[in-house]
Every structure is written in C-alpha cells, then in structure tokens.
Amino acid sequence: MNSIFPFNDYIDLEFYLYEDNEYKKVLVNLLELTKYIKASKFYFGDYYNDKLGDFNEDKLNEVLNCNWDKYENYFLTLHGIKNQFFNLRISPFLKEVSVAKVRIHKAIFEKNKIKILDKCNNISEYSSTMYGFADASVSNPYFYKGYGQIKFGAHWLTWYGEWALQYFKDKHIEEIKDNSYDFVKKETFIRSQLYVSPWKYRSKQFHKTYRNFMRKVKIEDIVLEYNKKHEFSEIEKKN
C-alpha cells in the first residue's frame, strides 16, 4: 500500500503575521477561512503538547480574546475532514513573526476559490505587514493549468495561473498585463527579487520600508525590467 500523503490533492495557504495593533482583526478574519475545513478537533497550548480535544467554538472564542503576552511559542490547531487543518504558531518573541497555515482540499478550494481569495484580501487590508503564499506549484499538479503562487500582503504578488490572472484583473487588485504570464517559470528571479524571508528581517523599520516599496512597484515594470536583463530563447518562449 502506498503510504505517501497525497499532497497533490490539497492547497496550502501560508501566512506570516506581524503582531501589530491590528493582529486580533487579522486573526479573526484568518480563522474564518477555517470554516472550509469543517473542524472537529481543537488544541491550544504549549509547542510540545499536541493532544487534540473536541472542537469547541466557545473555547476558540476564549483563545481569541486572551492575553497573547502569556502565550509565546504556543500552538493553535484545528483539524477537520479530509485531513484538512489550520495551524497557528505564535511567535517565540512577541512583536515578531508568527506563522499560520491552512490546508484545504483541492476540490473544496476550487468550489469556493473566489470567496477564499476575497477573504485573503480582507486579511491583507488589516495587516499590510503580513504576507503569505499558496504554493500550488508544489502542492498540486495543475499549477500551470490554473493555479499560481499567491502572496498576500501590502502588495499582491503571484506566479499567475490563468483564472487567478483574470480574477486579479476583474477585482482591480493589481495592474497586470498579459505578458506577466511569461514570468511564470522564473522562480529563482521571483524569489530573489520579491520574496524576503520574514525570519531574517524582523524589525518594524524593515516591515515599513518593505511595505512602502511594494506599494510603489508595479508588476509590469518588474516584468519589463526582467525581460531586458534576460534574453529568452525561442524554445523558452514557446514553452
């Protein structure tokens, strides 16, 4: 029997959260994504204790309203149907980066993708120093057929899938030209130019500088700059 977990059946949404004054609003909105996993198990506690109890909405609300100063390095975990889950690790040191991850079954994500992306947009409006990604290039085989990697934050960045590209155009979230799609396979460039590890840079000044920079930059300008620096072969263009 094949025991390998079927990652291709899931979409992972991952968020890096900076704990500012809007953190609670971000968390409340983030947890609204968990309705899609239909949680049945719940845990909130120390990193080394992974015992799950029955899901209790009152307990969840209690956690949301607690004093977070007491809970550095704690985990909030919700487990749902079809191996779906929500995890939040509160940062080891307050005012630094916490990590949240939602794993949603691909069929459920596909059915509710616009609502899910709208919710992610709401999250980013509350916390412009927060960003995250749905790494569909890793988690499902249909990456080039429809899904892309999406980062949520002060600026929306994406390895554009076809429906995602149309969604961003329709919502006017970002000014995108069709030639942005040529960029889809240039992972090294995108990571080096646009993705900055939250673990390396934690200061408020960094987040402020990064946010201001991303508000000014335009995706099409980056694509044009990249095209000037790199000559694509005819084979690359056809592929």
Regions found by a protein language model. Name each.
Residues 28, 35-144:
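Internal, hydrophobic cores of structured domains that mediate oligomerization or house catalytic pockets
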